[in-house]
Amino acid sequence: MASQLTDVFARKFYYLRLSITDVCNFRCTYCLPDGYKPSGVTNKGFLTVDEIRRVTRAFASLGTEKVRLTGGEPSLRRDFTDIIAAVRENDAIRQIAVTTNGYRLERDVANWRDAGLTGINVSVDSLDARQFHAITGQDKFNQVMAGIDAAFEAGFEKVKVNTVLMRDVNHHQLDTFLNWIQHRPIQLRFIELMETGEGSELFRKHHISGQVLRDELLRRGWIHQLRQRSDGPAQVFCHPDYAGEIGLIMPYEKDFCATCNRLRVSSIGKLHLCLFGEGGVNLRDLLEGDTQQQALEARISAALREKKQTHFLHQNNTGITQNLSYIGG
């Protein structure tokens, strides 16, 4: 099914990133270094299972093929398995993924798969337990590693691992990461550090271009693969001697936004056209019952007329995004 969600730059949107909470129990230096602080979410709190069912139904009707559940830490919601099942009700949605810190992976991943989850991204910024603790504020490295093993045991053929690339922290550890994925079907995705409203100082200190790793991978014989239409923004590389893959997400690269295929809905029901963008379009008043789906679809489609051509990060724009937990990075 071709996506009906098309913007004025002829980009088609097949991929929804749906935040279901902004609460997180980790204190990652690049996201929530001081820990989670409630952002004043009052009124109805975070989206309910029924509201999630309605908003994903609308996106599915408009051609969305992939939904990623984000946060915060999605698995902190007690009804997380029910949320997966609610999204799974949409036959048009072929992929349901989660981005998680891995805290509850070992315990719950089999149940998530049974509910309909098809993909997992786990955040691991270092393979050194002490450095992992320093970055995340949690001494959970072994627990997260056990969770990744549990995901394979539960039947996931591949696990994606997200690593925020930081100068003088982990950028020099490529060989360690490559050894880890040589015999494991892990897609290791290095993500360039992005500047947010609260993270300007960290950005200036630790940002390094992913181009450095890209050049090194090509020098070592890694091969760039083609993207599918519902894939995320990573440039993916493979090598015949490795079971795993490497992905590079480089938002500061020229033309990064030209292939944008994803929209975001926050945990309080606002449609965000860009991670670094405007205040969002409220959808929640149309999620109260099943009778408003046509109006909901119309509002989503109309909002796309306002999507900008680029995120303007090159002009030092950080938008309203104070930290990445707010609308699910």
From Swiss-Prot:
Domain Radical SAM core as annotated: residue spans: 8-234
Superkingdom: Bacteria
Enzyme Commission (EC) number: 4.1.99.22
GO BP: any one term: Mo-molybdopterin cofactor biosynthetic process
Pfam family, one: Radical_SAM
InterPro entries (UniProt xref): Aldolase_TIM (IPR013785), Elp3/MiaA/NifB-like_rSAM (IPR006638), MoaA (IPR013483), MoaA_NifB_PqqE_Fe-S-bd_CS (IPR000385), MoaA_twitch (IPR010505), MoCo_biosynth_MoaA/MoaC (IPR050105), rSAM (IPR007197)
Cofactors (names): [4Fe-4S] cluster
Enzyme class per UniProt: lyase
Reaction(s) catalysed (UniProt annotation): GTP + AH2 + S-adenosyl-L-methionine = (8S)-3',8-cyclo-7,8-dihydroguanosine 5'-triphosphate + 5'-deoxyadenosine + L-methionine + A + H(+)
Cited PANTHER family: GTP 3',8-CYCLASE, MOLYBDOPTERIN COFACTOR SYNTHESIS PROTEIN A
UniProt protein name: GTP 3',8-cyclase
Lineage, opening ranks: Bacteria, Pseudomonadati, Pseudomonadota, Gammaproteobacteria, Enterobacterales
